[in-house]
């Protein structure tokens, strides 16, 4: 698996965590098996007795759908921003003024 594939898989895992409740059972099952369980398209197709192409199309469409949810809701983006702020806060625990600025940044994200 290349670096870009790994980054995409990691992103899809996060998007799946945030948006899985908005997906149908079928969409949820396919994404979970493909991205979380590392099943191949053929293995998923065999599991659900459908064609490999049907699985591919469903995963691609569902991936596009969760990306669209992310564009509108920005849950993953805000999660990443909060995580970066928390990391910076840990570095400045002895500086109350800086901590207060980070707290304001966190409040602004909400």
Curated annotation (Swiss-Prot):
This is UPF0122 protein SAR1212. InterPro entries: RNA_pol_sigma_r3/r4-like, UPF0122, UPF0122_fam_protein, WH-like_DNA-bd_sf. It comes from the Bacteria. It comes from Staphylococcus aureus (strain MRSA252). Belongs to the UPF0122 family. Might take part in the signal recognition particle (SRP) pathway. This is inferred from the conservation of its genetic proximity to ftsY/ffh. May be a regulatory protein. The lineage of its organism: Bacteria, Bacillati, Bacillota, Bacilli, Bacillales. Pfam families: UPF0122. HAMAP family: UPF0122.
């Amino acid at each position: 698996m290349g670096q870009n594939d790994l980054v995409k898989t990691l992103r899809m895992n996060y998007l799946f965590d945030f948006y899985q409740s908005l997906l149908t059972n079928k969409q949820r099952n396919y994404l979970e098996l493909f991205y979380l369980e590392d099943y191949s398209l053929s293995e998923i197709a065999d599991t659900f007795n459908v064609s490999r192409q049907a699985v591919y199309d469903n995963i691609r469409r569902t991936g596009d759908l969760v990306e669209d949810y992310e564009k509108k809701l920005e849950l993953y983006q805000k999660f990443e921003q909060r995580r970066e702020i928390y990391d910076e806060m840990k570095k400045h625990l002895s500086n109350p003024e800086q901590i207060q600025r980070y707290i304001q940044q966190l409040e602004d994200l909400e």
